[in-house]
């Protein structure tokens, strides 16, 4: 049977309570509320003091019993007179503390009864059943760094490169679906990335037919990954759904697939072309660095910057013609051009002496079709003009 007596004394103010006309209702409610809060604070303070006193008494009793036990262990037979007196003192203290403990517990029990009989109010009418809620939420995934992604891709390729290439060579929908069913670990971003790189490599190697075959499987994998993102599921859980959809798709869906395939092949061709051009630039720069003369100038660039009459001298490999041409030029201009020829290695001073001495100093062949092994003698120092035109380093 339900006991409804607990509802008989509820101390809750009601705006509809009747009050005397000469009494301000709002002030009366405010006074009642303040008095109720003060009573609750006083009761809470009394409860805390009793609880603190009870815990302190228990602590002292436990400490006294511990000392008494240590004394009994140290002097099991009762010990000397001093030890016996200490034991009696501790026993008396323990007895007194037990009596105090019972008093504290009695006061606590009276306080609990008092609390139980107190009328309910807006503060005590209900209590929290729990103070927190726990939800099973998916842990936030930390974004991988570029180094982690690269290492993950490298490890995956080392383990499954043969299987990825086998998938890339398939063509029929049923064959692709069956192979992925047997190897579901291939349905991932790493497989798609490897196929993209493979397509570019094949285009660079001018294997266009094979590139188009692998490109088809690349788009298949990318469509599966996009479907997984849209459905917010693991790609391995939806690749069968993709094949079911693609095999029964309408003309518009197939056109979308084919358009994406053609656009991808164009991007592959563009990337392959850019890679080839970059490789050619690197090769040309490497060759240019090899050609640089002792002064850090490129002989090709220097030759092309020479006046036509000087270019003819290098083309003909005629030292006398070179001397005559320099003698007719302005000394400052002649010195400028010849110094550039020396810095680029196009002209090597004392070439004959260096060759006879077994040195490495030999004139570089000029880039006008002349033999690169040819050696040029230094211009004779007979005239001031020729000496100035030689432009010694």
Swiss-Prot record:
* Subcellular localization: Cytoplasm
Spell out the molecular function terms from Gene Ontology: heat shock protein binding; protein kinase binding; protein-folding chaperone binding; unfolded protein binding
The record ties this protein, via Gene3D superfamilies, to: 6.10.140.250, Cdc37, Hsp90 binding domain
In terms of SMART domains, this protein maps to: CDC37_C, CDC37_M, CDC37_N
Q: Where is this region: Disordered?
A: 352-393
Q: Which SUPFAM superfamilies does the UniProt record give?
A: Hsp90 co-chaperone CDC37 (SSF101391)
Q: What does this protein do?
A: Co-chaperone that binds to numerous kinases and promotes their interaction with the Hsp90 complex, resulting in stabilization and promotion of their activity.
Q: Gly residues bias: where? A: 356-368
Q: What is this protein called?
A: Hsp90 co-chaperone Cdc37
The biased composition feature labelled Basic and acidic residues covers: 378-393
Keyword check for Transmembrane helix: no
Return the InterPro entries for the record.
Answer: Cdc37, Cdc37_C, Cdc37_Hsp90-bd, Cdc37_Hsp90-bd_sf, Cdc37_N_dom
Offer a single GO CC term for the protein. cytoplasm
Q: Name one GO biological process term.
A: protein folding
> Which UniProt keywords are given for this protein, alphabetically ordered?
Chaperone, Cytoplasm
Transmembrane stretches, by residue range?
A: none
Q: Which Pfam families match?
A: CDC37_C, CDC37_M, CDC37_N
Q: What's the source species' lineage?
A: Eukaryota, Metazoa, Chordata, Craniata, Vertebrata
Name the family the entry cites. Belongs to the CDC37 family.
Q: How does it assemble?
A: Forms a complex with Hsp90.
């Amino acid at each position: 049977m339900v006991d409804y007596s607990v509802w008989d004394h509820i101390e809750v103010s009601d705006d509809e309570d009747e009050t005397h006309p000469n009494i301000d209702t709002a002030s009366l409610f405010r006074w009642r509320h303040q008095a109720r809060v003060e009573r609750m604070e006083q009761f809470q303070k009394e409860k805390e003091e009793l609880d603190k006193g009870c815990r302190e008494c228990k602590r002292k009793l436990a400490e006294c019993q511990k000392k008494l036990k240590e004394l009994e262990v140290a002097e099991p037979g009762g010990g000397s007179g001093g030890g016996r007196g200490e034991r009696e003192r501790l026993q008396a203290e323990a007895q007194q503390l037990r009596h105090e403990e019972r008093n504290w517990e009695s006061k606590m029990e009276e306080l609990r009864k008092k609390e139980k009989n107190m009328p309910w109010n807006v503060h005590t009418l209900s209590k929290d059943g729990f103070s927190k809620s726990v939800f099973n939420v998916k842990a936030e995934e930390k974004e991988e760094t570029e180094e982690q992604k690269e290492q993950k891709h490298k490890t995956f390729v080392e383990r499954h490169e043969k299987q990825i290439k086998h998938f890339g060579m398939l063509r029929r929908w049923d064959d692709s679906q069956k192979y992925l069913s047997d190897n579901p670990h291939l349905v991932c971003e790493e497989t798609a990335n490897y196929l993209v790189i493979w397509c570019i490599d094949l285009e660079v190697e001018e294997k266009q037919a094979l590139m188009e075959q692998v490109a088809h499987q690349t788009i298949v994998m990318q469509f599966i990954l996009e479907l997984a993102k849209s459905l917010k599921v693991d790609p391995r859980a939806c690749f069968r759904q993709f094949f079911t959809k693609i095999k029964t798709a309408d003309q518009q869906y197939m056109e979308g697939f084919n358009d994406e395939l053609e656009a991808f092949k164009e991007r592959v061709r563009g990337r392959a072309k850019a890679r080839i051009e970059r490789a050619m630039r690197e090769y040309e720069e490497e060759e240019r660095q090899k050609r640089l003369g002792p002064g850090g100038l490129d002989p090709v660039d220097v030759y092309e910057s020479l006046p036509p009459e000087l270019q003819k001298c290098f083309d003909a490999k005629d030292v006398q013609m070179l001397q005559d041409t320099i003698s007719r030029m302005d000394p400052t201009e002649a010195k400028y051009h010849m110094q550039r020829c020396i810095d680029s290695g196009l002209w090597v001073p004392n070439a004959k002496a260096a060759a006879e001495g077994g040195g490495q100093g030999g004139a570089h062949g000029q880039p006008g079709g002349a033999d690169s092994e040819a050696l040029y003698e230094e211009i004779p120092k007979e005239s001031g003009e020729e000496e100035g035109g030689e432009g010694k380093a």
